[in-house]
């Protein structure tokens, strides 16, 4: 039976960048300005009729089932929620994670066999069997003493066929932020392989693909490591750094390295910048495009900005070359990311806020394809998005989840 709880007033809660703990106290909702001329309004299939007792966090979707976490401290335990998303999202169940006051990240393995949930305060990685996708069964709770400050994000991915977890550990209790790499070949018995203190002041997120690991190091920029596919002898237990770049304004929150199956291009990675914000009201931060054609010397070449709103997480429909970005109070944004992004006319360049160097502006290049959820008539605050099978699923911190139709290429 679905578990439903009353939504406490949260529009005045300070997000302060939900992930960064910085603060903003702007009293009124920021007007989101859309200056582009051609993006379509993304159509909405439906909204999950559910208002949690706290704010909705990350979302992961597999088949017709979605999983969402709850963000915001609780004095006892938190739950993640399970949804039927075959049509309009419907809440079907929830799972309590004992002793976890906040749940941040959630991810499903590529084969659909397991689910991982990152817990903060106290930190751990909870791994569940998805033999029955809507009845997860706890397999293990990885919680060594040095991660108790909190696991903020947990990326899972394969390196040479073997599953690993990449955990971004919060600073706290006098300890600095850490990256922890875990062997998840046996999800019932995770094995720690590698730990390093890194990030300024956070290592916020990672992205793993083809034996390369991209790290979001907040004000230390983006680092690229060989962990089995970079040709420098790196492994998950002994990574080798290939290159690093600092993006405009820092605050590197998340990364997606694009591999376009149609063009064969793997030249660009997309970086989210998360500034300060207030839940349901305001946010700040751009999408930055870095050219990684030379992994030893990555460089920022383009950006996308929304006046009055900031980005959070991405999902990319790589087959069609479309990036979907969660944009907090700016809804969902769909961007054309196929082809050359770092070359443009002078008229297509702009100065990113905080920079004195003009870069290609994706909006001026006509790359904005769609905008979603600004037509709903209610405050929105989109934390995460996932593209899957022609639909875009969005976790909204103040409204539960939405299911939208994807956009088409022009």
Task: Tell me what each language-model feature is.
Residues 12-13, 353:
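Residue-level signal for mature regions of secreted extracellular proteins and peptides
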Residues 9-10, 337:
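General helical structural elements
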Residues 21-410:
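Feature marking well-ordered beta-strand scaffolds used for ligand recognition
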Residues 1-9:
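Bacterial N-terminal signal peptides that target proteins for export
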Residues 16-18:
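C-terminal motif of bacterial Sec signal peptides marking the signal peptidase cleavage site
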